[in-house]
Amino acid sequence: MKNTFVLFLLLAIAKGAWAVNYNTVPLPKQVQLTNDNGFLLDASCVIVYNGQDAQMKRNAHFLSAYIDKQTGMQLAVTDKAPKGTKCIRLAVNTKLTNDEGYKLTVGKRQGIVIEGGSARGVFYGVQTLRKALADEAKGQSAVLMPSVVITDEPRFPYRAMHLDVCRHFFSVEQVKEYIDILALHNMNTFHWHLTDDQGWRIESKKFPRLHEIGSKRRHTVIGRNTGLFDDTPYGGYYTQEQLREVVRYAEERCINVIPEVELPGHALAILAAYPELGCTGGPYETEPTWGVFDDILCAGNEKSFELLCGVMDEIADIFPSKYINIGGDEAPKKRWEQCAKCQKRIQEQGIHGDSTLTAEAKLQGYFTNRMEQYIKKLGRSIIGWDEIMEGDISQSATILCWRGIEHGMKAALAGHDVIMAPTAYCYFDYYQLDEEKVWSKPLLIGGYVPLQKVYSYEPAPAELNEETRQHIIGVQANIWTEYIAWRSLLLYQMLPRAAALSELQWVKPEQKDYDAFVERLPRLLTVYDQEGYTYCPSY
């Protein structure tokens, strides 16, 4: 057997074939090389998908395109394999209990088989095969595939990255590229931050002033709130059809898009369009600087809820996601303390402050619960930043923890599902190299989150018991764009830290090894190069 394989290998090399490496990023759960003679992938192979499932067909065409880009070989796609043809078979295997799990088998007899617990699982098997192909295989007539059985599944069901398009706007094509990168890293969720003080990015047919006025600011601050401005109007929004287009694009890549509409704070773009919804009546403008601002939506004004509920109707019609993110962070209560309508609401609701929270802080709990009740009628659930815990909120609310690990632990102990995204490990708008931080080049918001620190993070702390740990449903990294205005810097901040993040999301703690990860990383960097992605070359 050994001599036969050696002969096979020599013949493969003579034909210009190159071997692959299955130690990809994220690392598969189990990679077992077998004694079969392996498989020679060449242009005569056909990709066969099983059944009439549209996602399976897309998976097959994705794989064909990936192999073409990686090797130059153009493989046909079919739902029926001709007899005697070498095949890559894609199929659903109901014996795999995790919908996102897969089994990848390579051997001389069976060829290449990717089985998934669902079409989504097959998609992740396709990504592993894509990343396993050697960069050196480009232009070669064949690729040697060592025989192997890979069994794999993700650790967490929620694996996400976030993008702020309010401080700076990114086009539909740039957002699609961002989604492509998430798919490459086995992520399944895109958190789209669509509204903030600095811009409203959603076309609203019910409340058109939101995008007509709220999407534009008259100028933008230069540097870190220097008081100097560029005197250039700035704006942009997505039409409802463009939003649907992005949702479809993401769904094809097994990614769920969660829209975020900030409330009650970070709402100056709303107030610029509808000043009667503020506590003072204005005047307001779409904010040209960065920070946290006192003017928020009036909790005592019924028209605030009329607008928000109307917007949620539109959001639910565009986005099929189970979740709608309602923000809830950084909402100062100064205006509510001075607002007659808000004080009347506090009295009507019988809200009283205590030693830990003021009545105005608890009023936000009323605001959150009221919006959650409406969103539930739409068949959806809410996610909110961890500040929404500062009030009597429903246990059904999912908490997105950003201020520190302790907030996530508190939420999990209270029975909430929790997504971990702490600034110290998961803010990719922070510097990643020490020299960047020292010299402030590029100009960023600050902070320091190098690659190794991202990799070191453990989202489900050992202090939690097993039952509570089950409430940690995933991990997310955030990119805020106060100082990130163009594609190349966005991708530079994202990569390769997204690779480290993907291992937090996918790989169990006992498998993690930073040195081994760094050894595997260069192979993924070749994919970045092929795709034209900018990335930080030092780590």
Predicted regions and their residues:
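Bacterial Sec-dependent N-terminal signal peptides
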Residues: M1-N23
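Contiguous, structured surface segment used for ligand recognition
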Residues: V20-F156, L489, Q505-G532
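Flexible loop/turn segments at secondary-structure boundaries
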Residues: Q55-M56, F169-S171, D197-E203, P264-I270, ...
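A generic structural signal for well-ordered alpha-helical segments
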Residues: I67-D68, L182, A250, I375, ...
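Residue-level detector of anion-binding/catalytic polar loops
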Residues: Q74, N188-T189, N256, S381, ...
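Feature activates predominantly on carbohydrate-active enzymes
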Residues: L96-F305, C309-Y323, R370, Y374, ...
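Active-site neighborhood of glycoside hydrolase catalytic domains
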Residues: I270-E276, T280, E285-A397, W402-K410, ...
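Flexible, acidic glycine-rich loops studded with aromatic residues
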Residues: S381-A397, W402-Y539
